[in-house]
A protein has these predicted regions:
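Charge-biased low-complexity segments
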Residues: 1-113
Length: 113
C-alpha cells in the first residue's frame, strides 16, 4: 500500500453499497467459527460475549486498522483483533459506482458450548 494520500483516500461512514464478506454473512460466521482460537484464560473463567470491532475496508477489500469498540475481556478482544486482521479480502464498499474506503463494524461472538 502506497504512502500517497489524496481526496480519494477518504474513509466513508455511509456508502451506497456496504463492504461485504465474500459469499455473504453466513460464510463470514462460518469463517469466524472455523478460525477462532478461544483463549484458554477466558475458557477457564467461563467468559463469553460479543466483541465489536471497527475496521477500515480498503478499496482492494483488505481489512486494516482494527479497533475494539465494545470490549468483553482483554484476551477475547485480542483474539477478535487477530481474527478480523486475518480475514480474507472483502468485497469493497462503493460510492457513486467506485470502490471506496469504508469504516465497518464486525461483531465477534464468543460462546462456550
Amino acid at each position: 500500500m502506497g504512502e500517497e494520500e489524496n481526496e480519494n483516500d477518504e474513509v466513508f461512514e455511509i456508502v451506497e453499497k456496504n463492504p461485504s464478506f465474500p459469499e455473504g454473512d453466513k460464510a463470514q460466521t462460518d469463517w469466524i467459527q472455523q478460525n477462532m482460537r478461544y483463549p484458554q484464560s477466558a475458557k477457564e473463567k467461563n467468559i463469553q460475549g460479543r466483541v465489536l470491532v471497527q475496521v477500515i475496508v480498503n478499496k482492494d477489500g483488505s481489512i486494516v486498522e482494527p479497533k475494539v469498540l465494545r470490549s468483553v475481556d482483554p484476551d477475547l478482544d485480542k483474539e477478535a483483533i487477530r481474527l478480523v486482521s486475518s480475514m480474507p479480502k472483502w468485497i469493497p464498499g462503493k460510492n457513486n459506482g467506485k470502490e471506496v474506503r469504508v469504516h465497518h463494524s464486525i461483531v465477534i461472538t464468543f460462546r462456550l458450548n
